[in-house]
Every structure is written in C-alpha cells, then in structure tokens.
C-alpha cells in the first residue's frame, strides 16, 4: 500500500548549504521530518551547483519519511549571474542596471525548459526576456 502524503514543503535553499537553521529547520520541524537527514541528502545532491539558489519541493509522508525534488535555479538568479550583477533595478522602467545578449537568454531558457510551462524554446525565451525586463536588464539582439 502506498504511503499517505501529509504535506508538501517548498523552499529555496543555497546549493550545498542546507542547515537546520531557519528557514529549513522550522519548516521541516512542523511536519516532523528528520532535519539533519534532509540536509545531508540535499547537500550531497546539490554539491555540484554550489553558490546557486535551488528550489526544492519536499513531500512528507505519514510515517515522517520524505522525498524531495530539486528544480532549476530561478530565472532571476540566472539572469543576475549572466549580467554579473548583485541585484536588479528598484525602478526597472526608469533605471536599467545591466544587459544580456540574446544568446545568454537562449542558454538560460534551455536550462530552465523543464520547469517552464512553454511549448517550445521560443516561448521559454520570451518568458526569460520578460523576467529580465521586470528586473531592469536590457536584452540586446
């Protein structure tokens, strides 16, 4: 018989740096999950992507066991990395803070494709360009 799901927990955690401190500890503690076990598994799985923010969806079962799925880093984080910026513009309509090329947008779209609800690469590129626009990043090309 299948285990009964008692909840989902969605978090964004730096790759390879999960620890029991907030926000991880309290979120998992509420559901009774073994926090250290999750941290060990997550850090081992995301070791290669160190420095990136990784969204994770944790499924908690009635016997306090869990599984988790890691997703691709948020488009905003990838855009900031490509544009070599610390943060986006506070006023994206007025102040442009950086630029990315069409090639960089395509690279990000290819990486994000599994997590986006786009039918083709062109649609995914449009989504990434919209994110860039809302951050005050100009897309050239």
From Swiss-Prot:
Record's subunit section: Part of the ribosomal stalk of the 50S ribosomal subunit. Interacts with L10 and the large rRNA to form the base of the stalk. L10 forms an elongated spine to which L12 dimers bind in a sequential fashion forming a multimeric L10(L12)X complex.
Cellular component terms (Gene Ontology): cytosolic large ribosomal subunit
Post-translational modification: One or more lysine residues are methylated.
UniProtKB keywords: Methylation, Ribonucleoprotein, Ribosomal protein, RNA-binding, rRNA-binding
Source taxon at top rank: Bacteria
InterPro entries xrefs: Ribosomal_uL11, Ribosomal_uL11_bac-typ, Ribosomal_uL11_C, Ribosomal_uL11_C_sf, Ribosomal_uL11_N, Ribosomal_uL11_N_sf
Protein name (record): Large ribosomal subunit protein uL11
Annotated family: Belongs to the universal ribosomal protein uL11 family.
Key word Transmembrane helix present: no
UniProt GO BP: translation
Function: Forms part of the ribosomal stalk which helps the ribosome interact with GTP-bound translation factors.
Coiled-coil ranges (or none): none
Single GO MF descriptor: structural constituent of ribosome
Organism this protein belongs to: Chlorobium luteolum (strain DSM 273 / BCRC 81028 / 2530)
Keyword match rRNA-binding: yes
